[in-house]
């Protein structure tokens, strides 16, 4: 049985080092897809690189926790900036859902302006689209646009979210992350998906070269480790041996 593996690199547009790492992992590794932060400091650079790398599918990384929003969001920003306090506001029932829906539409339009086409799919920075009150907004938007949505099945089940709300891969893994990234860890996520009988799987990753922006991230040097693993010839062979075809969200 053929299985589809989507290896999606998050944070396209975060920095030039991030962008170059994603392109390297696509051209010389197993990365097939990326998602772009349209308010990222290096988003124009990302769009330029994508034009010379048509084999890399590009989706949109919805941002509600970093930088400045594209629209006025007085209900979510502090001194005009977004931040991780969104979870506290969610717990307190103070999410400005109309502002969030409007910002999603603004970021989508910005993506199309930058890349010249619609995104292959939607996900989000720090998985904010899986916050229970935000999820139906993003899922309905994806359905309306006819594009796929990253759905973390485990979080959806725990939160009672509708897993059929939008088109998605059968499985999703965020486990290829942290100080201990390795070929073995990557392949364990595939083996677990096979054991669940899933026909398609997205594996999230963050390959990058380290630059000043990445140095300031809480998740820094492991991005280099991810890049090494994802560009391993042995890994690509092991993926094929498990019956996976490298693909994108266009394949699900």
Swiss-Prot record:
Gene name, Swiss-Prot/TrEMBL: chbG
Chief place where the protein resides: cytoplasm
Summary of the function given for this chain in its UniProt record: Involved in the degradation of chitin. ChbG is essential for growth on the acetylated chitooligosaccharides chitobiose and chitotriose but is dispensable for growth on cellobiose and chitosan dimer, the deacetylated form of chitobiose. Deacetylation of chitobiose-6-P and chitotriose-6-P is necessary for both the activation of the chb promoter by the regulatory protein ChbR and the hydrolysis of phosphorylated beta-glucosides by the phospho-beta-glucosidase ChbF.
EC class name: hydrolase
Name assigned to this protein: Chitooligosaccharide deacetylase
Cofactor entry: Mg(2+)
Residues annotated to bind Mg(2+): 61, 125
Annotated GO MF terms: chitin disaccharide deacetylase activity; deacetylase activity; metal ion binding
Reaction catalysed by this enzyme: N,N'-diacetylchitobiose + H2O = N-acetyl-beta-D-glucosaminyl-(1->4)-D-glucosamine + acetate; diacetylchitobiose-6'-phosphate + H2O = N'-monoacetylchitobiose-6'-phosphate + acetate
Taxonomy, superkingdom: Bacteria
GO cellular component, one term: cytoplasm
Pathway the protein acts in: Glycan degradation; chitin degradation
Compartments reported by the entry: Cytoplasm
Keywords for the protein's UniProt record, in alphabetical order: Carbohydrate metabolism, Chitin degradation, Cytoplasm, Hydrolase, Magnesium, Metal-binding, Polysaccharide degradation
Assembly, per entry: Homodimer.
Family: Belongs to the YdjC deacetylase family. ChbG subfamily.
Its EC number(s): 3.5.1.105
Pfam families, per the entry: YdjC
Protein's GO biological process: chitin catabolic process; diacetylchitobiose catabolic process; polysaccharide catabolic process
